[in-house]
């Protein structure tokens, strides 16, 4: 690790349509092979579909969905002696957002709808109502942390 200075977090430019940094980050998570305009089309179409069905603001729905998917604790492997323990740790806010977005996108990609925009819209709707694959993933991670609470004293 370098000893000179701590490198700061890069400032991300907000997306052009809604002027939201969170949405810009989400676009970057969706993007594949550097095709940003395609990723933007997918997200905007998904948000329009969701807003049409729920008759709420686009960003409010996205924020609600993310809030229900973000994990507050996770487990990390820690080797002590000859055995490996799954140690529960709190998740930092930046990682919390990143994991939530990643899980939403993964869950959307596994769905059966025709286009990615419809899949993402479906997953966002499910997540905002506290159901769906991404929320299940968060519940599994929380359950794992709860089960391994006995090893919390191995924290670093």
UniProtKB/Swiss-Prot annotation:
Keyword Heme in record: no
GO biological process, one term: translation
Protein family: Belongs to the universal ribosomal protein uS7 family.
A Pfam cross-reference name: Ribosomal_S7
Disulphides: none
Name of protein: Small ribosomal subunit protein uS7
Purpose of the protein: One of the primary rRNA binding proteins, it binds directly to 16S rRNA where it nucleates assembly of the head domain of the 30S subunit. Is located at the subunit interface close to the decoding center, probably blocks exit of the E-site tRNA.
Gene3D superfamilies: Ribosomal protein S7 domain (1.10.455.10)
High-level lineage: Bacteria, Pseudomonadati, Pseudomonadota, Gammaproteobacteria, Alteromonadales
Record-linked SUPFAM superfamilies: Ribosomal protein S7 (SSF47973)
Gene name for this UniProt entry: rpsG
Alphabetical UniProt keywords: Ribonucleoprotein, Ribosomal protein, RNA-binding, rRNA-binding, tRNA-binding
Gene Ontology molecular function terms on file: rRNA binding; structural constituent of ribosome; tRNA binding
Cellular component, GO annotation: small ribosomal subunit
Keyword tRNA-binding belongs to the record: yes
NCBIfam families per the UniProt record, alphabetical: rpsG_bact (TIGR01029)
Record note on quaternary structure: Part of the 30S ribosomal subunit. Contacts proteins S9 and S11.
HAMAP family: Ribosomal_uS7_B (MF_00480_B)
């Amino acid at each position: 690790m370098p000893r000179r200075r701590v490198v700061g977090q890069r400032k991300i430019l907000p997306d052009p349509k809604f002027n939201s940094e969170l949405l810009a980050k989400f676009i970057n998570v969706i993007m594949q092979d550097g095709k940003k305009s395609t990723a933007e089309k997918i997200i905007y179409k998904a948000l329009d579909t969701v807003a049409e069905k729920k008759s709420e603001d686009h960003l409010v729905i996205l924020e609600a969905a993310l809030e229900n998917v973000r994990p507050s604790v996770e487990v990390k492997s820690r080797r002590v002696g000859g055995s490996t323990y799954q140690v529960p740790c709190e998740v930092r806010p930046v990682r919390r957002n990143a994991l939530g977005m990643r899980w939403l996108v993964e869950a959307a990609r596994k769905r059966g709808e025709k286009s990615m925009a419809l899949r993402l819209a479906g997953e966002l709707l499910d997540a905002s109502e506290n159901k769906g694959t991404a929320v299940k993933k968060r519940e599994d991670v929380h359950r794992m942390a709860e089960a391994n609470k006995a090893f919390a004293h191995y924290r670093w």
